[in-house]
Amino acid sequence: MSKPPPKPVKPGQVKVFRALYTFEPRTPDELYFEEGDILYIADMSDTNWWKGTCKGKTGLIPSNYVAEQAESIDNPLHEAAKRGNLSWLRECLENRVGVNGLDKAGSTALYWGCHGGHKDVVDMLLAQPNIELNQQNKLGDTALHAAAWKGYADIVELLLVKGARTDLRNNEKKLALDMATNAQCASLLKKKQAQGIVRTSSNADEYLDDEDSD
């Protein structure tokens, strides 16, 4: 029995597959790929021929071939971040895989990069212009919660420099500081929170007479 066809791509959304077999093109427009290659499908508007990219080359792929001879990768950016696979992460971003996509747990790729302590992955994700730093997953945890819980002070520092919020509580009402498992992480978070308190009080004095203030 053949598998049901994959759901069509929404505009701006990229579907990712891993080829199970090598495909030999019959025309110059078709895309050559080998078993195990990652395929990025950006255009499924033609039901018979999908436009895809593999190893930086773009071409047409028969849709029935992808449906039957390739396995769908639902959250490729998350997988790359979990594994600390920087080259795959870069390829996903170059092929416009959404940087803030959520997996079934409601977590972002940034969360998993922080959870795994993959500093180079976190660096690359934080360099994306529209990265969402403070996304909370189904447990209410942010990337900062994950880094603090796992004790990665270097990643905690990266997130704080980028502007991650320290005041978000998870479903257990815990701040990232409450989950910090080592003194270095706790110290960084306490320092940041103290700065926030000082800034808030000084702003109140500074803008007391400002009509634009809330």
UniProtKB/Swiss-Prot annotation:
Entry annotated with the keyword Hydrolase: no
Record's subcellular location: Cytoplasm
Domain of life the protein comes from: Eukaryota
Pfam family, one: Ank
Residue ranges annotated for the SH3 domain, each copy included: 12-71
Classification via InterPro entries: Ankyrin_rpt, Ankyrin_rpt-contain_sf, SH3-like_dom_sf, SH3_domain
Start and stop residues of the ANK repeats: 72-101, 105-135, 139-168
Annotated keywords: ANK repeat, Cytoplasm, Repeat, SH3 domain
Principal location class: cytoplasm
A single cellular component GO annotation: cytoplasm
Keyword Cytoplasm in annotation: yes
GO biological process: signal transduction
Function: Induces bone resorption, acting probably through a signaling cascade which results in the secretion of factor(s) enhancing osteoclast formation and activity.
The name this protein goes by in its record: Osteoclast-stimulating factor 1
Organism: Xenopus laevis
Protein's gene: ostf1
